[in-house]
Amino acid sequence: MPLFPESAYQLELPKMHRVLQKFDTTQLENVEETVRAEMHKKEIGSLVKPGMRIAMAVGSRGIQNLALIVKTVADELQNMGAMPFIVPAMGSHGGGTAKGQTAVLEGYGITEEAIGIPVKSSLEVDEIGTVECESGTVQVVVDHYAAHADLIIPIGRVKPHTDFRGPIESGLCKMLTIGLGKFEGCTRLHHMGAIHFPTLLPDAAKLVIDKTPVGFGVAIIENSYDQTYHIEMVPADKIHDREPELLKIARSKMPKILVKEIDALTVQEMGKDISGAGMDPNIIGRAARGRLKDFDGPEIQRILVKSLTKDTHGNASGIGLADYVLKSCAETIDLGATYTNSVSCGNPEGGRIPIQVMDVKEGVLACLRSGVGVDLNAPKIVYIKNTLQLGEIWVSDALIEEVRRNPQLILCDEEQSIEKLQMS
């Protein structure tokens, strides 16, 4: 059923122009060599003993070179005489099932065959103690396989969180608590409210480190182009001191959309592999409960989502941040996985499906006509692949002068209709 009378569809949308955004391109020259060197630091290598059963905790984010990093760590542990295995550390992702979480890892090339070690996936958890916050007392739990290992190694990306600000946000502490907490632990911690996470997550992580055999963490930082910028092995007793420093580095490497105002933002794809919120609030300025605090990016009036990523496996948690979604995208949503994740994270808003539109033109028109003060003859439209890959964007005619004035932006000699745009 059309959203508008036939005459409204006669409005011709402006051509889109390809623009390159310039950020710091520094990245690791050799990821494998860096991992091996870090593993052989005295304070790291001395923690590994022959015969140890070591749980490598791996999450659900689409991290560049993740399979290579996991494989290299596993190889080095085996060379040291240890017996490593992988446990999914992703809270309620993968539909909140053991099989689903294994499938998420498989999507990243992390399988028993590829890595050469077992993958032990279970929702069974062990209670290890309690922590306090203003909302009450919460029982902290840890994956059963990890809790009974001789050593635990969380492997994860450090970056700003999507819902709160604090000295420690997304990273090793979150992996140890929400990730290894599986569905039960994730639900319990989120039930306390993300407003308490700046202190709750570090406190819970300290309990995990004190009560379980956490050896060290593998901290990964990416640059603005989704490339591996930094890898560091952090001993367990230094995680709480080092992670805030790593977060500052990660924050400085975050990309952004370098225009000031956007009437309609079209996002080609979203998913849990891109961000816990499907679309990173640090990029779009929208979080589960409104505008993201201290957001310094563009003022975005309306957002249209075209599709889900393959590696999100139908989990559209965060789709509620959009205003409109293509009908074809909505039909690919796994409601079970989406609702499980949204409810366990205390964010039912993120699981609400926006108004469905038949095609891109109808979606963009809906964005423009529901915006405030939009000049329909010169709309400011931006098209991105996702919120992780922002080295290239497409902008409408009305933004060209702003692009030309910004030394970080390069206007290319390419144009396309937004209806036909599909970034690779």
Predicted regions mapped to residue ranges:
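N-terminal amphipathic/basic leader segments beginning at the initiator methionine
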Residues: 1-34
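Glycine-rich phosphate/diphosphate-binding loops that line cofactor/substrate pockets in enzymes
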Residues: 38-55, 78-79, 258-259
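Short glycine-rich or small-residue beta-strand-to-loop segments that form or flank ligand, phosphate
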Residues: 53-62, 85-92, 382
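Histidine-anchored nucleotide/phosphate-binding helix
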Residues: 64-83
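An acidic, phosphate/nucleotide-engaging active-site surface
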Residues: 100-167
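Conserved phosphate- and dinucleotide-binding cores of soluble alpha/beta proteins
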Residues: 134, 145, 154-226, 232-233, ...
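A conserved active-site cap/scaffold subdomain adjacent to cofactor or substrate pockets
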Residues: 224-282
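C-terminal non-catalytic interaction/assembly regions of soluble proteins
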Residues: 281-424
